[in-house]
Curated annotation (Swiss-Prot):
Protein name as catalogued: Thiamine-phosphate synthase 1
Database matches in SUPFAM superfamilies: Thiamin phosphate synthase
Keyword Transferase: yes
Organism of derivation: Streptococcus pneumoniae serotype 4 (strain ATCC BAA-334 / TIGR4)
Role description: Condenses 4-methyl-5-(beta-hydroxyethyl)thiazole monophosphate (THZ-P) and 2-methyl-4-amino-5-hydroxymethyl pyrimidine pyrophosphate (HMP-PP) to form thiamine monophosphate (TMP).
Cofactor section: Mg(2+)
Gene for this chain: thiE1
GO MF entry, a single one: magnesium ion binding
Keyword Transferase assigned: yes
Amino acid sequence: MFHKELLKLYFICGTTTCQGKNLYTVVEEALKGGITLFQFREKGEGALEGLEKLELAIQIKELCKKYNVPFIVNDDIDLAMEIDADGVHVGQDDIGVDEIRKLMPDKIIGLSIRNEEEFQQSKVEYVDYVGVGPVFGTQSKDDAGGTIGYEGLELMRKLLPQMPLVAIGGIQTKHIKDIIKTNMDGVSIISAISYAKNIEKTVREMSEQ
């Protein structure tokens, strides 16, 4: 069952976006700090594939379960179904959300939308939440596209007044208060958590914003 409070502090990570640290340990520290949702995003140069990816996904899914935090898979619908993940998150160029809803009727489905043009072509009636961004410049995602700033967040809230919305892209602790003022339901973060020296403490500080 999805509710918008899950978006409050949404951590996204994979082995290629945690500076060579052990991903399991990184996620465990973030869970201890109080993340509300986790997305396994195994992409980019050197990303795990096949059995290695599957085994790690299962381990982290079980870890998230221990903390009652839903486990979302980025893009890989087959993996999400195979390991019975709590949901999937897809971009504009991935499989259509209407198709995913047929395959995963009871799961959480998230969709990335950057601007009004993408909004017009999106079947938002099939999704549980929308990821809006990139708000700021980001090193974590090489496919992120142009930044939208706070204005872009405000526009998306006007276009989707009732939809649970989470901001993404280059977000640091200092930005969170201003992002929430744009009526976002939460923030999704990659490197500001995974690169932190003390992940648990950083996450705690973020959740207090």
